[in-house]
Amino acid sequence: MSRAEPARTRTFSWDDPLASAAKGVTMDGLDYLRLVASGELPPPPIASLLGMTIDELEHGHAVFGLEPAEWMYNPIGSVHGGIAATILDSCMGCAIHTTLPQGHAFTTTDLQVRYLGAMSHDTGKVQAIGEVVHVGGRVAAAEGRIVDGDGTLLAHGTTGCLVTRPPRADAQRHRQVV
């Protein structure tokens, strides 16, 4: 059985993510994310791929927007759960990032998502709201939720993140000597 050519296509473009990341380490997390949100720095490729937007930023708080689309569907005809996980991971991680000083970064260590309602292209714009629960010297935690335009809760998530610090000057000297 031969398969017909697809009737739908999707293309996207992105900027060099390392150039933006290099600028990010020169400022605190909130200032960096504000430049991304304003368009002064390009968004990361995942945001371009999914069409995610940064709708709100405050210290310890990040809201991302997303328009569910047909190309995001799973085999049963609704938006794939990985899309919800991705936008939750993004808003919760960025909520943590808004609290970090210059040169600090984070990486997700765990992510838990509870799916409470389906998304489709008929859902309309959804927002993922991330809130910091704890930020320490090495670990951070946040929670997030995805709501539709009526405020209906579609998913809830929690995350743990490792906070990374810039290398110490004496550690860099040691690396250069060795």
PLM region spans:
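Terminal targeting signals and extreme-terminal segments of soluble enzymes
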Residues: 1-178
